[in-house]
């Protein structure tokens, strides 16, 4: 069982570490711009770091759920790769947003595409799981013909 989900677990742990990094950046920005909790407003430089962290945190549960469903029901490697792309895009998003609101846009779109791909993989995997066995075998046979490397 562990071998079947090791990549998903590694990407999950990397995601948790990335969330911790974002939180530490907010703590650092609070000190640099003298914004004490519970305040969430201050100079624009602080607010951008704060918003970037909050935005990343808001999407993290969606990311985790789709990562695991796609990895278990579709393909672990494909889901893990999409997960890595998503996390890298979120890191770039955070770094860009910390510098300027405009610099967040390209990584935001990249992370959204990766997340939607995970949603699609999860949905396809679940659909295949619930199809009758004969229909599933026929569809997988055709898919293997079209995509021999898969």
Curated annotation (Swiss-Prot):
The keyword Endoplasmic reticulum applies. Glutathione binds at residues 30, 51-55, 58-59, 93-97. Its EC number is 4.4.1.20, 2.5.1.-. It catalyses: leukotriene C4 = leukotriene A4 + glutathione; (13S,14S)-epoxy-(4Z,7Z,9E,11E,16Z,19Z)-docosahexaenoate + glutathione = (13R)-S-glutathionyl-(14S)-hydroxy-(4Z,7Z,9E,11E,16Z,19Z)-docosahexaenoate. It is found in: Nucleus outer membrane; Endoplasmic reticulum membrane; Nucleus membrane. Changing residue 59 to F: Does not affect leukotriene-C4 synthase activity but substantially increased KM for GSH. Residues 28-48, 95-104 are lumenal. GO terms for biological process: leukotriene biosynthetic process; leukotriene metabolic process; long-chain fatty acid biosynthetic process. The modification Phosphoserine is found at residue 36. It comes from the Eukaryota. InterPro entries: 5_LipOase_AP, FLAP/GST2/LTC4S_CS, MAPEG, MAPEG-like_dom_sf, Membr-assoc_MAPEG. It is a multi-pass membrane protein. Keywords: Endoplasmic reticulum, Leukotriene biosynthesis, Lipid biosynthesis, Lipid metabolism, Lyase, Membrane, Nucleus, Phosphoprotein, Transferase, Transmembrane, Transmembrane helix. The active site is at 31 (proton donor), 104 (proton acceptor). Inhibited by MK886. SUPFAM superfamilies: MAPEG domain-like (SSF161084). The keyword Phosphoprotein applies. Phosphorylation at Ser-36 by RPS6KB1 inhibits the leukotriene-C4 synthase activity. Catalyzes the conjugation of leukotriene A4 with reduced glutathione (GSH) to form leukotriene C4 with high specificity. Can also catalyze the transfer of a glutathionyl group from glutathione (GSH) to 13(S),14(S)-epoxy-docosahexaenoic acid to form maresin conjugate in tissue regeneration 1 (MCTR1), a bioactive lipid mediator that possess potent anti-inflammatory and proresolving actions. Homotrimer. Interacts with ALOX5AP and ALOX5. This is Leukotriene C4 synthase. The lineage of its organism: Eukaryota, Metazoa, Chordata, Craniata, Vertebrata.
């Amino acid at each position: 069982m562990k071998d079947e989900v090791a990549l998903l677990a590694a990407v999950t742990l990397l995601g948790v570490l990335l969330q911790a990094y974002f939180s530490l950046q907010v703590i650092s920005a609070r000190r640099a711009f003298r914004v004490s909790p519970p305040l969430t407003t201050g100079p624009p430089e602080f607010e951008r770091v704060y918003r970037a962290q909050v935005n990343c945190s808001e999407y993290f549960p969606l990311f985790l759920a789709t990562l695991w469903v796609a990895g278990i029901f579709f393909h672990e490697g494909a889901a893990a790769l999409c997960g890595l792309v998503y996390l890298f895009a979120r890191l770039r998003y955070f770094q860009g947003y910390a510098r300027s609101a405009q610099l967040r846009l390209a990584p935001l779109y990249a992370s959204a595409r990766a997340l939607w791909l995970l949603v699609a993989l999860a949905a396809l995997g679940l659909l295949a799981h619930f199809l009758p066995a004969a229909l599933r075998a026929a569809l997988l046979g055709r898919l293997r013909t079209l995509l021999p490397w898969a």
